Swiss-Prot record:
Origin: domain of life: Bacteria
Pathway the protein acts in: Nitrogen metabolism; nitric oxide reduction
Function: Anaerobic nitric oxide reductase; uses NADH to detoxify nitric oxide (NO), protecting several 4Fe-4S NO-sensitive enzymes. Has at least 2 reductase partners, only one of which (NorW, flavorubredoxin reductase) has been identified. NO probably binds to the di-iron center; electrons enter from the NorW at rubredoxin and are transferred sequentially to the FMN center and the di-iron center. Also able to function as an aerobic oxygen reductase.
Cofactor: Fe cation; FMN
Pfam families from the UniProt entry: Flavodoxin_1, ODP, Rubredoxin
Source species taxonomy: Bacteria, Pseudomonadati, Pseudomonadota, Gammaproteobacteria, Vibrionales
Cystines in this chain: none
Species of the source: Vibrio vulnificus (strain CMCP6)
Binding site for Fe cation 2: 83, 166, 227
Protein's UniProt name: Anaerobic nitric oxide reductase flavorubredoxin
Amino acid sequence: MTIHVKNNIHWVGQRDWEVQDFHGTEYKMTKGTSYNSYLIREEKTVLIDTVDHRFSQQFIQNLQMEIDLQSIDFIVINHAEEDHSGALSALMEKIPNTPIYCTEAAIDSIVGHHHHPEWNFKTVKTGDSIDIGNGKQLVFVEAPMLHWPDSMMTYLTGDAVLFSNDAFGQHYCDERLFNDEVDQAELMEQCLRYYSNILTPFSALVTAKIQEVLSFNLPVDMIATSHGIVWRENPTQIIEQYLAWANDYQEDRITIFYDSMSNNTRMMADAIAQGIHDVDPSVAVKVFNVSKQDKNEILANVFRSKGILVGSSTMNNVMMPKIAGMLEEITGLRFKAKKAAAFGSYGWNGGAVDRIHARLTDAGFETAISLKTKWRPDGKAMRECREHGQQIAKLWAVKDKSTLSTPVNAFQSATPIEGIEAQQPLTETTPTADAAHSADCQCMVCTVCNWVYDPAKGEPNQGIEVGTTWADVPDYFLCPECHLGKDVFVEYQG
C-alpha cells in the first residue's frame, strides 16, 4: 500500500496499531504509531528511511509492488534508530551496492545495529545537496541530538517538503495521513506527549536548529515526519509550537503525583490540591498516583506545569521505588524554570520526604518547604495539608499571568466539519452544594474529595437506603469518589 503525498512523492511506510511500548517500556503508546518511509521518483529514485525491523518483509513486498527495487538510485537514512533503519538489512540483501546517504555519526549507529561495514555509505553534512533531476535537489541539514547524535533532516527543493525525521512527529496511528484529516485534539495531545517525554532535554538544541533552518529562507509547504501524520495544512504551526515548548514552557498548572502504601499520602495529596484551589481557582491542578496512572501522561503534565508536588510514604527510610524512578526520569528530562515541593506520611521516620526534596533541588527545581504527616492524617493534619496547599498557591502565584503559556488543546484546522457549529468552551466548575442539597439537610461532606452524603438520597450502590442518617450508615461505608472511610467525613455546613 502506498499513499500519494505530493507530486512524485509517495508514503511507503507501515502502520502499527498494536504497539504499546517504545524505548523498551519507557514510553507508552496510547494511539499506536506509524513508521514513515517515503519514495521519491524524479529522474532519480530515492528512498527516505525504512521501517521498524519487525515489518521488514512487509515493507519490501510493498515496495516491490510499487517499483523494481533495482531502480532505487540511493537511500537516505535520516536517523539510524531501529524504528527508522530496521528494514535496511533485508533491503540491502536485495540491492547490496545501493549508496546510503547519512551523517558520519549514523554510520557508527547503522554498523552497530546491522553489522555491515561494507555497505556503500556516503556521508553528508549541513548544506550538502544531491541533484535528483527535474530541477530538484535534496538538501541535508544535520540535527544532532534531535534526538540522537546521528539525526538529520532532508529538504526537497521544488516541492518544498521537509523530511524532518523524529522532529515534529508523534506516536499516532490513523488511516488518514495528513494533519488536516485527523482529530485535532488527539493530534495536539500526542505531539505534546512526544515532545515532553522525548525532546525536552534537547530544548535548547530544538530552538537553535529551528532558527538555523529558518535562516535558510526555504519555503516549507509540507513537513513529512517519520512517525504519525504529515503536516500538509499550515505546516509551520508545529514549528511555532515547538519554539513555544522549547522556551521554558509552563502553563498556570500545578501537578501533584505520589505513591502511598496505606492511602495516607493520597489523603495529603487531595487536601493539598483543595488548598491550592481555595486560593487560586483559576490554576489547573492535576493529581496522579504513579502506581496506577500513565507515567508518560504524568511527565507531560509536569512539562506543562509551573510547579509540582511530589509525595511518598517512607519505606525503609527511603521513598517508594516508583517515586524514585519518576524523579530519575525527571532529572534526565532537565525541566527548566519550575518550582517543586515534597510531602508524605510516615510512621517511624520521614526520610522519604527529605530525599525527595534533595532530589528535586538537584534536578534544578526551585524547592519550597516540605510537609510531613505522621501516620494516618486526622482532622488536624488534613487541615494542615489544606493550609499547605493554600501557602503553595500563594507562593507560586504569578502576578502577570500573561507571562505564562496559554494551553492549546487542539491544532487549528482551516476546514470546519460541516453541520457542526463551534461551541463556547465549558468552564470546569463544581456544582454548588445549595444546588444539590437543601440548606437544612443533615449531610456529611468528605474532607478529601468534597463528595456529599445526603440522607435524602442514601447511597444505593452500597445498599444504604434513602432516609438513612449518618449515624446509621455502616462502618464499612466508603466514599464513592475517593474510596476512603467514614472518618474523613465532617458535618456539611451548607
